[in-house]
UniProtKB/Swiss-Prot annotation:
Belongs to the cytochrome c family. Binds 1 heme c group covalently per subunit. InterPro entries: Cyt_c-like_dom, Cyt_c-like_dom_sf, Cyt_c_1A/1B. The keyword Nucleotide-binding does not apply. Electron carrier protein. The oxidized form of the cytochrome c heme group can accept an electron from the heme group of the cytochrome c1 subunit of cytochrome reductase. Cytochrome c then transfers this electron to the cytochrome oxidase complex, the final protein carrier in the mitochondrial electron-transport chain. This is Cytochrome c. GO terms for molecular function: electron transfer activity; heme binding; metal ion binding. Heme c binds at residues 22, 25-26, 88. PROSITE patterns: CYTC (PS51007). The keyword Ribonucleoprotein does not apply. The modification N6,N6,N6-trimethyllysine is found at residues 80, 94. Keywords: Acetylation, Electron transport, Heme, Iron, Metal-binding, Methylation, Mitochondrion, Respiratory chain, Transport. PANTHER family: CYTOCHROME C.
Length: 111
């Protein structure tokens, strides 16, 4: 199922998902440093593998996907399938509502 068919996202629920599943490796605040994964500030509209100061896998750089709701929705289902060779070890979010909630949170927190 595509993002067009996804339930409306709840950013409060998405914040909880981020804190429990993403914050170990990612930050969202402007000027926050990189952790195991890159800082996600300015995520929407950015091409994969282009955050300054972060060492990406060749797979992320070569994929050249532009991050938006639709691409994140598909990526977050199974990151390793979407970008084979990515360094991201997270297995993904199988529930459509979890992905929609996380995307709603990321849209607010990374703008």
């Amino acid at each position: 199922a595509s993002f067009b068919z996804a339930p409306p996202g709840b950013s409060k629920a998405g914040e909880k998902i981020f804190k429990t599943k993403c914050a170990e490796c990612h930050t969202v605040g402007r000027g926050a440093g990189h952790k195991q994964g890159p800082n996600l500030n300015g995520l929407f509209g950015r091409q994969s593998g282009t955050t300054a100061g972060y060492s990406y896998s060749a797979a992320n750089k070569n994929m050249a996907v532009t991050w938006z709701z639709k691409t994140l929705y598909d990526y977050l289902l199974n990151p390793k399938k979407y970008i084979p060779g990515t360094k991201m070890v997270f297995p993904g979010l199988k529930k459509p509502z979890b992905r929609a909630d996380l995307i709603a949170y990321l849209k607010e927190s990374t703008a």
